Structure formats: C-alpha cells, structure tokens
Curated annotation (Swiss-Prot):
Its EC number is 2.7.7.2. Belongs to the archaeal FAD synthase family. SUPFAM superfamilies: Nucleotidylyl transferase (SSF52374). It comes from Methanoregula boonei (strain DSM 21154 / JCM 14090 / 6A8). Its cofactor is a divalent metal cation. ATP binds at T11, F12, H16, P17, G18, H19, N94, Y121. Keywords: ATP-binding, FAD, Flavoprotein, FMN, Nucleotide-binding, Nucleotidyltransferase, Transferase. This is FAD synthase. It catalyses: FMN + ATP + H(+) = FAD + diphosphate. The gene is ribL. NCBIfam families: cyt_tran_rel (TIGR00125). One of its GO terms (biological process) is FMN metabolic process. Gene3D superfamilies: HUPs. GO terms for molecular function: ATP binding; FMN adenylyltransferase activity.
Length: 148
C-alpha cells in the first residue's frame, strides 16, 4: 500500500508556534509529511529570510510532525512536487497562494493533489515571524532586555 503523502511549503524563518501548528495539522491529513522549505533566492513576496536556508531546513527537519524536509527547486516550485507525488498539498492561512490557480497549475502538470488551506493558530499572539521581529525591536529599542 502506498503512503498518503502530504506536502507543506513555506519559508519557516524564525520558527514559531504557528509553524508547528501548520505542520501538525498538515501531518494529520496523511501518512507522510513532506515539507518544502523555500530557498533564500525564491522568497520575493516578503523580506528576505533572516536565517539561511540550510538552517531553516535543519530546524524544520527536526520537528516531530515532519517525515521529510527538502529545499525547494531553484527555478520551478513544482519540480519537488512532481517527484513527491502528494495526495494533498497544504497551504498556511496567510500564504500567498490563489487556491484555484494552484489547482489549475497542478492539473496542467497531471498532479491530482487536493489543496487544503490550514487555519490560523489561535493560541498566542506571537504566531508569526513578523510579530516576533516586531516584539524584539520594540523590546530592544526601549532598552528592555527582556523579550517576554
């Protein structure tokens, strides 16, 4: 029997509870969770990652829900998906994907994966890298050396 593979993608810069939630919920949708970590050069929709891609990959690989983690392709985001052949592709609540367009692109490549958007993590106010960076800047800028 073939394992039901799930693919989750993201930058995963400054890991936080929202990332863990996204990956945990993604893992529940199949037997294997494959995570494609964005390459530094391909992050164009937001500021460049603070952590280099190799470190982000190592951290994601160490997370309990993750069975396999790889770096994305340099030029074609669908190349790893072609290789993995997932049953499901998950996208985070705030990822900039047009779900219908993504479904069309998958169909064009004969990749019949279901696309599932994972909901927002609601158990804390520091569930995004942007909010964490903002909190650090505010704390350090005010002379307060405590983050929490």
């Amino acid at each position: 029997m073939t394992a039901r593979r799930v693919v989750a993608t993201g930058t995963f810069d400054i890991l936080h509870p929202g990332h863990v939630y996204y990956l945990t919920e993604s893992r529940k949708l199949g037997d294997e969770l494959w995570v494609i970590v964005a390459r530094d050069e391909n992050v164009k929709h937001k500021p460049r990652p603070i952590l280099p891609e190799a470190q982000r990959l190592a951290m994601v690989s160490a997370l309990r829900p993750v069975d396999h983690a790889i770096l994305g392709d340099h030029t074609d985001m669908f190349c790893p998906i072609d290789d993995i052949r997932p049953a499901v592709i998950t996208i985070g609540f705030n990822q900039y994907f047009d779900e219908e367009k993504l479904k069309g692109q998958l169909a064009e490549r004969n990749l019949p994966a279901e696309v599932v958007r994972i909901g927002k993590y609601e158990d804390g106010d520091l569930a995004s890298s942007r909010m964490i960076v903002q909190r650090i800047v505010e704390a350090r800028g005010s002379g307060d050396q405590r983050i929490g």
